[in-house]
Amino acid sequence: KCLHIIKPEDKDLRFALDHYLMNFFWRKYPARILRENAPKFAKAMANMPEWKNVIKEYGIFQRLQLSITRKGKLRMAKPVMKFNKWRKKKKGLIGSRIQWYRVLERHIFKKMPLRHDWVFIESFFGKSYSDSPKYLYEYLQKTRGDKYRYIWVLNNKSEALAKTGKHTRVKMNSLRYVYYASRCGYRIFNVRQPAWNKKRPGVVFLETWHGTPLKKLAFDMDDITSASQNHKTLFYKHGREWNYLISANRFSTDVFERAFVYDRDKILEYGYPRNDILYADNKEEIAAEVKKELGIPEGKRVILYAPTWRDNQFYDRGKYKFTLALDLGRLQKEFGEDSVVLLRTHYYIADILDLTEYEGFVYNGSQYEDVSRLYLASDICITDYSSVFFDFANLKRPILFYAYDFDEYADEIRGMYMDMEKELPGPILRTNDAVVDALHH
């Protein structure tokens, strides 16, 4: 009944309900539903507008069971469900791969001596060669060279990393990851470490973090929808392992001390290493390189659009939905002759965007490793609640704040550390009309 009363424009609500309905079909349907009611549920699944998108989130055997259910074949769905339950139970008895790696970690790797000439480096859970860890690493390569062995956590090969000095690349949560994490005397991370990956006595852990906070963090948050209930406890435990925490400014220092419950004496208020490039003597050359890499034509105004991650875009563990609020079609019509849009989204949803209809006007920089280089290639920045504006402001270029859901976001999701209507370095725009008008001027 819920599916029938939802308005067509309520896409996010439909997507969430579709997901929960799929979970019902996947976990309970064959065992709980009477055979005579099977056609009704099959019809409900057949009418799901988001079927193709939601089904992608499930494994091959789950998809098989759901597809059979969608055809109303209850008899066939039951044995598939039983097989899935058996498979899951068997996997639990055997243990996951990382569990076996941790056995080696406890009984072998952590009994081997620490290597104080090894540096373990990770940026965004191994997703990219980027951010402050990248620039600290390159500085160490330049000034210390072979004095240290550098171990980079990176899931995919990086041409930029390959051009640097000697290093070792390991994949996140691989056996080599567990080995080097157990033995390296130094760690440089820009996000929290895995809960199981506890450092040994004698290890020096530098946490660079990844941005000046605009949205409330950790112990400053009243409600957390995209994290488990023990989020704050884990955050506190992680912070106890950090020997030092980098802060970009006094504002960040005050926030980190309170939100992370962290010792102020261990906060290094030095600014972010990643921002050094914004003051480089050759920044115009770097900007030209970035445009060439992304295929952006020379001579066009580059509009960087970097919307933040919203907690209400989470709908299940590890699963997210996203709808782009900026009207790209209208921007193309208004500014396509002399401008292009460079889109930079959160890594959670970087892979689910389809921009084919805007080819030649919108360039997806979401997978580009180094956002600091994107700043140099951009003439203007449009964001909302993302802390990117703190970094972009170093360039003293125009910044627009497209906060179409300002009231909802500020009051219901996380809240802000700043009074956005009074303290932001640019106008707050709540409609596409306002964005177009601002870009014209």
Residue ranges and their predicted role:
Residues 187-216, 368-413:
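A donor-sugar binding/catalytic signature common to diverse glycosyltransferases
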Residues 4-8, 30-114, 120, 138, ...:
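Membrane-interface aromatic/basic loop that binds lipid-linked glycans or pyrophosphate carriers
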Residues 170-186, 192, 342, 347-390:
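Donor nucleotide-activated moiety binding/catalytic core segment of transferases
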Residues 102, 214-315, 319, 441:
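A nucleotide-sugar donor-handling region in carbohydrate enzymes
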Residues 1:
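Conserved nucleotide-sugar donor-binding catalytic segment
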Residues 356-360, 387-441:
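Catalytic binding pocket for nucleotide-activated donors in carbohydrate/polymer assembly enzymes
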Residues 134-138, 166-233:
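Extended catalytic core of nucleotide-activated donor transferases of GT-like folds
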Residues 128-142, 273-355, 429-431:
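Conserved catalytic-core segment of nucleotide-activated headgroup transferases in glycan assembly
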